[in-house]
């Protein structure tokens, strides 16, 4: 990797862990579609005001922020990136099950389950 690509990755407004990238690869392989990308978005709702959402998408929209890691692409729309700036997407396995989670430095409060937040 060149120094230019490393600095682009370090300055990305959102990032994701190796565990998240590995899980996306696994799910993408299960679907048999190498064009699937993980889209992270924000919606109104949840017990704290905003909720995180995750879906697979084949389309990269013009205003999307796109980050690549280990051949996996993470997409965030223009509205959501303002709330997710500096966040890290991870994949966790625990007693409550397995799920993608967001560590968001912009969240003033989060709910107990971690799926909603307020700013």
UniProtKB/Swiss-Prot annotation:
SUPFAM superfamilies found in the cross-reference section: HesB-like domain
Cofactor binding note of this UniProt entry: Binds 1 iron-sulfur cluster per subunit.
Gene3D superfamilies for this protein: HesB-like domain (2.60.300.12)
GO molecular function annotations of the record: 2 iron, 2 sulfur cluster binding; 4 iron, 4 sulfur cluster binding; iron ion binding
PROSITE patterns: HESB
InterPro entries for the chain: FeS_biogenesis, FeS_cluster_insertion, FeS_cluster_insertion_CS, FeS_cluster_insertion_RrpA, HesB-like_dom_sf
Entry keywords, A to Z: Iron, Iron-sulfur, Metal-binding
Keyword Iron-sulfur: yes
Record-listed iron-sulfur cluster binding positions: 47, 111, 113
Cofactor: iron-sulfur cluster
Top-rank taxon, per record: Bacteria
GO biological process: iron-sulfur cluster assembly
Purpose: Required for insertion of 4Fe-4S clusters for at least IspG.
Family statement: Belongs to the HesB/IscA family.
Subunit comment: Homodimer.
Protein name according to UniProt: Iron-sulfur cluster insertion protein ErpA
Species assigned in the record: Alcanivorax borkumensis (strain ATCC 700651 / DSM 11573 / NCIMB 13689 / SK2)
Gene name, Swiss-Prot/TrEMBL: erpA
């Amino acid at each position: 990797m060149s120094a230019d690509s490393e600095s682009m990755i370090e300055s990305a407004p959102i990032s994701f862990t190796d565990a998240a990238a590995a899980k996306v690869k696994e799910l993408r392989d299960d679907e048999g579609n190498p064009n699937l990308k993980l889209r992270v978005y924000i919606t109104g709702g949840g017990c704290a005001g905003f909720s995180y959402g995750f879906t697979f998408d084949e389309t990269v929209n013009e205003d999307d922020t796109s980050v690549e890691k280990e051949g996996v692409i993470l997409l965030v729309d223009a509205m959501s990136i303002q709330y997710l700036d500096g966040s890290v997407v991870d994949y966790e396995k625990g007693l409550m099950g397995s799920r993608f989670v967001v560590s968001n430095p912009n969240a003033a409060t989060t709910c107990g389950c971690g799926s909603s937040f307020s700013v």
